[in-house]
A protein has these predicted regions:
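Conserved active-site loop/cleft motifs that coordinate metal ions or position small ligands
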Residues: 649-652, 697-703
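Periplasmic polypeptide-binding modules associated with outer-membrane biogenesis and secretion
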Residues: 2-3, 24-340, 370, 552-556, ...
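Gram-negative/organellar outer-membrane beta-barrel architecture
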Residues: 166, 170-171, 265, 285-514, ...
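Bacterial N-terminal signal peptides that target proteins for export
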Residues: 1-11
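C-terminal outer-membrane beta-barrel translocator/porin domains of Gram-negative envelope proteins
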Residues: 339-342, 455-641, 651-674
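Hydrophobic, well-ordered secondary-structure elements that form the walls
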Residues: 296, 353, 396, 515, ...
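A generic beta-sheet turn/junction motif
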Residues: 137, 150, 313, 508, ...
Length: 738
């Protein structure tokens, strides 16, 4: 009941603030002027290619920002300020708030013109736009009513090419090569696309001087049809020649340093050649020019690229000069940081050496030395309570595929990197010491001009060694029959994982999709079977006297955002992961198991404090080891809004859980069963604040449990029976959750 009273007071204060803000909205609106209260767009008959959201974006004036699309609180904050600008409080309120948007009739008329042009460009040549206004006191709302009418179609279509050579190049006698199609809807943007298509095609075939102004249209309308004639004008400078537009070839190709202090280009000639699509004695190509810029631009060793062409007088030849300025090859950085792990505070520092041009081929070498210290609270019976960690990680990245028998042309066509990494990590805790060796070889590549990325982990080896475990820890957790379990024991044994994986990601700003599949132990299992290797008492094969892990794991992560205006956005997220141990393993390695709760999952719970399924400890404490699973589901929705300055806010709701695929004695109620799914789904809700500093985002999320599958009766529905001390969780994080 106390939590319900706190929640009720918060809601009352929130709505009181909204009422106060709305009452003061017109404080700074001069007499004779109006506050632009609302901008609305309606579309008659609602054709598919004319949306109200798109049309509203053409409005020259938009109303003041509404928090969560409901209330103009920034305007209210501004209106709470006084008129005395010498007082700091008034200046603060004005800087935090937003001044009123005053209605401007001239801008409204320009908006009508813009909307009419937008409809015309889409083929609605008989459209009209009406402007309506409504006033109430000092507030005014505008309504733009769009009447598109019947769209026009392309009727007759004719290509008239004055240059016979270009006419043959384009092959326009065959209508299959036309970018425009008779019978399709007339759209100005399609006409412009056709001009650009023809221009690009000719630029790529050597027509260096050709530009889209040589392409124009002649049109006449009959009924609801537009008859088009595409005219390609001649280049008058070429009169008397076989072709009126000349094709240019590259005569000389030279490289030079773009730095005045250093005349040397610190890149091998082979790297220069493979990065350059422009070829001597080849025809000029605009695409080759852009690809050359792109290829040099992604080399970390290159700071600046400038490509210039010079026409050789009285010829159709070009001299190409490529200027390159390289970055400083070596850098050293030092980064201290504070740490907080489950309330235990500490400090860490990282020293990084980076060489961006190791072998004069833009290879990137990174050597990172990290040290960390943490004071652990609440440990009894141990000789010390400090956690120490030291790690050395080396990464070498090549800006291309490192594969045998791969042609230079194939390497150039794909934006790829090859990476080899080595890691040695030392962890000394009061309870145990752990050593980790890791080695990996992976490829990443991006197809040309595509918002997708692929990754292949050709080999990823992890070797975990537990050289020492304290007698106290063994006695309390590993040897005590009442407390030990298979997951706990497996987590503190030596471990060997040799995995391969494949990942795919797609991101076009509004939609993001990430998938990843990995598997481990299959090749080792094959060799063990072929050579009839011996097994241990559990029937497991070993390598280096360690039973290696064997499993398959797949993850998919999908995010979709809907932008209402520049200040309001709705974001949906779905995450699903499944991992299955088999063959040489009956349990997943702890590092590969799923957990839920925390800043990026169910935000009503702290990290690793929910699931699997309906599992809970009898003493009510968090069980970091047992609250893991083989399967995870995350369903999230956030309504994000801009508040003021660099502060954003979000209302969120989360649902999901983790499960085991098998029934484990130590995790009762944790196995996934489809018929029990409704009772096993957890849910939470809350409010978040985010400071957006452009380069990074600092996030504070306040979550409350809504449905808790670990309990029955009243505790199963904290949404109806809230208790702040039991159901509240606070999260601090850097970056957005999805």
């Amino acid at each position: 009941m106390r939590g319900l009273r706190v929640l009720s007071k918060t809601i009352i204060l929130f709505f009181a603030a909204l009422l106060l803000a709305s009452c003061a909205e017109t404080k700074y609106v001069p007499d004779g002027s109006y506050l632009l209260d609302k901008v609305k767009v309606t579309v008659d008959q609602r054709p598919e290619d004319v949306s109200t959201a798109q049309a509203k974006s053409y409005a020259r004036q938009q109303e003041n920002v509404r928090w969560f699309s409901l209330v103009k609180l920034p305007l209210g904050v501004y209106s709470l300020s006084g008129r005395d600008s010498t007082k700091w409080m008034n200046r603060l309120l004005k800087s935090m708030g937003e001044p009123p948007v005053l209605y401007d009739s001239a801008l409204a008329r320009l908006t009508v013109t813009d909307l009419q042009q937008m409809l015309f460009n889409k083929g609605y040549l008989d459209s009209r736009v009406e402007l309506w206004t409504r006033t109430k006191g000092k507030k005014l709302s505008t309504i733009y009513k769009l009447y598109p009418g019947q769209p026009y179609q392309i009727g007759r279509l004719e290509y008239r090419i004055a240059d016979p050579v270009i006419n043959d190049e384009l092959g326009l006698e065959d209508s299959l090569n036309w970018g425009l199609k008779p019978g399709s809807q007339f759209r100005v943007e399609e006409l412009d696309h056709e001009r650009k298509r023809i221009t690009k095609l000719l630029n790529d075939r050597g027509y260096y001087r050709f530009h889209k102004d040589f392409v124009r249209y002649e049109a006449d309308t009959t009924g609801h049809q537009v008859n088009l004639k595409l005219v390609l004008s001649a280049d008058k400078t070429g009169e008397g020649l076989d072709t009126l537009h000349q094709r240019y070839k590259i005569r000389n190709l030279t490289y030079e340093s773009g730095s005045r202090q250093d005349s040397t280009i610190h890149l091998r000639k082979k790297v220069l050649r493979e990065s350059t699509y422009i070829k001597e004695n080849g025809y000029y190509s605009g695409s080759d020019l852009q690809n050359t810029y792109n290829h040099f631009g992604r080399l970390g060793a290159v700071k600046y690229t400038n490509i210039q062409f010079r026409e050789v007088p009285d010829t159709t030849l070009l001299d190409c000069r490529i200027q390159l300025q390289t970055n400083k090859p070596s850098t050293v950085s030092f980064q201290p940081e504070g740490t907080n792990t489950a309330g235990d505070f500490g400090a860490a520092a990282t020293l990084t050496y980076q060489n961006r041009n190791l072998f004069r081929g833009a290879e990137n070498l990174s050597v990172e030395l990290r040290g960390a210290f943490e004071a652990i609270e609440g440990l009894e019976g141990y000789s010390n309570s400090n956690f120490l960690e030291y790690s050395l990680e080396t990464r070498l990245t090549f800006p291309r595929f490192i594969l045998p028998f791969l042609s230079a042309d194939t390497r150039r066509r794909v934006n790829a990197t090859s990476e080899v990494s080595l890691l040695y990590d030392i962890q000394d805790r009061p309870e145990f010491h752990r050593r980790l060796w890791s080695a990996g070889w992976r490829y990443k590549w991006v197809p040309s001009a595509a918002p997708v990325q692929y990754q292949v982990d050709l080999l990823d080896i992890n070797y975990v060694l537990m050289p020492w475990i304290s007698e106290t820890f063994k006695r309390m957790y590993l040897d005590d029959v009442s407390s030990r379990n298979a997951i706990l024991r497996y987590n503190y044994e030596d471990l060997f994982i040799a995995k391969v994986g494949f990942g795919f990601s797609y991101n076009n700003r509004r939609t993001a999709l990430k998938t990843n599949v990995e598997t481990a132990g299959n090749l080792l299992q094959l060799f063990s079977s072929l050579f009839e290797a011996k097994t241990n008492e559990l029937g497991q094969y070993k390598i280096f006297n360690i039973a290696y892990a064997q499993y398959i794991k797949g993850d998919i992560d999908f995010t979709r955002s809907i932008q209402f205006d520049y200040a309001n956005q709705l974001v949906f997220h779905v995450g699903l992961g499944i991992a299955y141990p088999y063959g040489n393993s009956t349990l997943l390695p702890f590092e590969k198991r799923y957990f839920s709760g925390g800043a990026n999952s169910l935000r009503g719970w702290s990290v690793r404090s929910i699931g699997p399924g309906r599992y809970k400890r009898t003493d009510g404490r968090i069980d970091f080891l047992n609250q893991t699973g083989d399967m995870k589901l995350d369903l999230n929705v956030e309504y994000r809004t801009h508040l003021f300055w660099k502060l954003d806010a979000a209302l969120f709701a989360d649902a999901g859980n983790i499960w085991t695929l098998r029934e484990y004695r130590d995790q009762p109620g944790g196995q996934f069963r489809l018929k029990d799914l409704p009772e096993q789904i957890a849910a939470s809700y809350g409010l978040g604040f985010r400071f957006n500093f452009d380069y990074f985002i600092v996030r504070f999320d306040l979550g409350m449990k809504a449905v808790n599958p670990a309990y029955d009766e009243e505790e199963h529905f904290p949404l109806l029976h809230p208790k702040l001390s039991r159901d509240f969780a606070f999260h601090f994080a850097v970056g957005l959750p999805f």
